[in-house]
Amino acid sequence: MPKQIPVYLFVGQLESGKTKFIQETMEDPNFDSGDKTLLLVCEEGEIEYDPSKFAFGGVHVAQIEDKSELTAENLTALEKKSGCGRVIIEYNGMWLIQELYDALPDNWLVYQSLATADGTTIKTYAGDSAMRSLLLDKIARSELIVFNRAEAVNNDAARQELHKLVRQASRKCDIAYEFKDGLSLIHISEP
């Protein structure tokens, strides 16, 4: 049986801060497992990765530019080419999560799923039924959602609205708010 590969999945809409989150994670020496890492990038945002700032080597970056490339055969070939012991996926916000799960090789196991959302645009996404469905799709399987640029939602009414949105998709997903001066976990009592 092939070696099991842990997958760290980063999901969210375009411009929600996924690349920045992953870049910061890769700059943290505590994230160095000693394994080679396959970084799968499924969408191009405004920010590019800077591998020279990664805290460790052995990172192979691969682009998945079209959903048709998301197959078990292609992903297995990338695993073999990179010799990876773990995978980080920056997933396309317009693709459904189930499409990824259906494409993962049998030995790839989603170890952690993190969602990001932009506090300045989240209300717009939540108000549009098609975009809301895509957003809820990402939150449903995430352990944590980070609302960045949280100054835009830094009041009780906005946080209650976001809390309800997240709870519509998942009762288990933790909620964090990222402000310019740091990250904050704000507890809101469950109804």
Segments from the language model and where they lie:
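Nucleotide-state-sensitive switch-loop elements of NTP-binding domains
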Residues: P2-V11, S16, K20-G127
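Short boundary motifs at domain starts and secondary-structure transition points
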Residues: M1-P2, L136
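A generic structural motif
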Residues: Q63-S68, I175-L183
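Phosphate/Mg2+-binding loops and adjacent switch elements
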Residues: R86-A176
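Hydrophobic pocket-lining residues within nucleotide cofactor-binding pockets
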Residues: L14, A150, P191
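Residue-level detector of conserved catalytic or cofactor/ligand-binding positions
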Residues: S184-P191
